[in-house]
Amino acid sequence: MDKRVTKTIILTEGDAEQKRHEILEYFHSTFDIDEKLYETLRHDETFYLRADRLRHPLIFYFGHTATFFINKLNIARIIDRRLNPRFEAMFAVGVDEMSWDDLDERHYDWPTRQEVKAYRNQVRTLVDELIRQLPLTLPIGWDSPFWAIMMGIEHERIHLETSSVLIRQLPLEQVVQLPFWDICPHCGEPPLNRLLPVPAGTVTLGKAKGDPLYGWDNEYGRHEAAVAGFNAAQYLVANREFLEFVEAGGYRERQWWTEEGWQWRQFRQAEHPLFWIESGDNWLLRTMAAEIPLPWNWPVEVNYLEAKAFCNWKSSMTGLPLRLPTEDEWHRLRALCDIPDQPYWVQAPGNINLEKWSSSCPVDLCRCGEFFDIIGNVWQWTETPIYPFHGFDIHPWYDDFSTPTFDGRHNLIKGGSWISTGNEATQAARYAFRRHFMQHAGFRYIESSAPVEIHQDQYETDALASQYCAAHYGDDYFGVANFPLTCARICLELMTGRELGHALDLGCAVGRAAFELARGGFRQVTGLDFSTRFFRLASRMQDEGYLRYALTEEGEIVSFHEVALAELGLTPVRERVAFYQADACNLPEKFTGYDLILAANLIDRLYAPRRFLAGIHERLNPGGLLVLTSPYSWSEEFTKKEEWLGGYREAGEPVWSLDELKKTLTPRFRLLDEPRDLPFVTRETRRKFQHSLAELTVWERQ
């Protein structure tokens, strides 16, 4: 039996004690193979060399995968003790460089290799005991203690791969080639690459919480897309095919590169792929621990920026619209080839999961239908920056696994490489790296005129905008009902027996009341807000059906939230709502003819509230209602003091806002009923809330 070959665990079926045994074996095999990787380092001193100036030395990663278990087990409250607090702080956080020149120049007092190995032994013993003793029930889900165990195992398997890339960047004299990490012996010239058709189709991505396999948070949720037909290269781009770009001077010609790519190329002074070595008239290839004559029929390994430049060059040379595939297009291609998933395959359908070699292999060796290397050999760069699926939820035990990458600057790689194991080798895996990042990664090009859709799904992080998102669509607090929803319901009660034609939500913020008015029966609802931020979010909710936002929990700690119209039962009415940006004190003429105007907590934020009130009757139909709410929290930040309706003294006497409202509106409006108090709560942090009382008044146009 090849000790390198393992499969991730099916967590939903079988006998509990048998599952315990499977997880125990999986844990130890993961620890073993990770330590086997570090045996390729020739000297103890090698552990302290920086293979990549943007990364830590390998001693960090040797300790990191072990401390991860302890840190996550403590967060999950499975254990309440530390083995080595110093190590568990020092090895906790890696380098997440945001640029190729983002150097980490800090000095670290690293422990010895022997000290770290002794610590790893302690962790292994502790986790072994936990696996043997913790209560285990099936299925194993997000809340199970064994999910934390699986999290540690799969995390270590990620670093098995990323550390192998760092070892590959060490000086050759610092590493040793071991038989365990065997190199593919096959090499030669590649076949001519050609484009083959991939018919149009639909892809459905995303896991449900009950999925049988362990997954990282970005895999959950749901995404559906109709994919236009395209032509895809039969093979990954081989070294020989990429050599044409190098020899054509592609690395020196600005026209082929993106702005980001050219800046990287200029900084690194790159002339060819990182792992190519020019040796006189010949080329060598650096594998993980050896140098060999460059196999022309192995896939080239480059970053996204280089792959993109090649596609631009190749497109110009051929006259074809060539580019990298999107994530959806990659899945469409995989579906066409009908490839089984790990752990369900009997034998890997590619050079993946360490089931073939510990290196790349020829691009025409692993057939998948008419194509080759749909999975395995090297990862494949895509055009898609990673984004969260609808229904995405953060796992509380690892709340920063994915969200820092939802920035539009981390592109997805698909398919896995020869050393991708565990979760990395599954179809649902979604790993993304900065575009300059080096990995065992290459690419396949496609021919398509379809535009590349970039999902602008970053979380709203502006504190005020996020507070409004939570106030409109989030939880209730302290028994106080949702304020926009309450306003809408009161308006609908007031409109009983009246015409439900056209309503205006003036100062709509992020739109909840407008949607609720439409649900309540209005045939048309217009939402207006002066703030670009709020208008944009309301429009996004209408157009895309969901919002994502980050709320401050404590200090720099935030929580991430997603709300959807479908969950609120508002999807059927969104076509009856329209949002616009407008100044309430200077409305365009087209905004008129309303049966109801709701101006919730608006007047004390206007720069000219008297002007607003003096002209608002022109926007209402005769008999229409104007509903105002306000806490009358006048501030010169928003309104010059001479424009305040109340909240000041005149001739020594207090002037109240309600009295001024009556004075201003009475000539054209009739006050219906007595004013009433309407409470609302604004969440600032997990432990800080504002409780306010707005006064609600209802006015009927004469």
Regions found by a protein language model. Give the residues of each.
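Conserved alpha-helix/loop element of class I SAM-dependent methyltransferases that forms part
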Residues: 478-500
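Conserved beta-strand signature within the Rossmann-like core of class I S-adenosyl-L-methionine
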Residues: 623-631
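A short glycine-rich, Lys/Arg-flanked "PGG" loop and its adjoining helix->strand segment in the class I
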Residues: 610-622
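S-adenosyl-L-methionine
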Residues: 540-586
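A short acidic, Gly/Pro-enriched loop at the edge of an enzyme's catalytic core
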Residues: 585-597
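Functional-site microenvironments in short loops/helix caps that host divalent-cation chemistry
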Residues: 152, 156-158, 166-186, 191-215, ...
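Conserved Class I S-adenosyl-L-methionine
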Residues: 553-554, 639-675
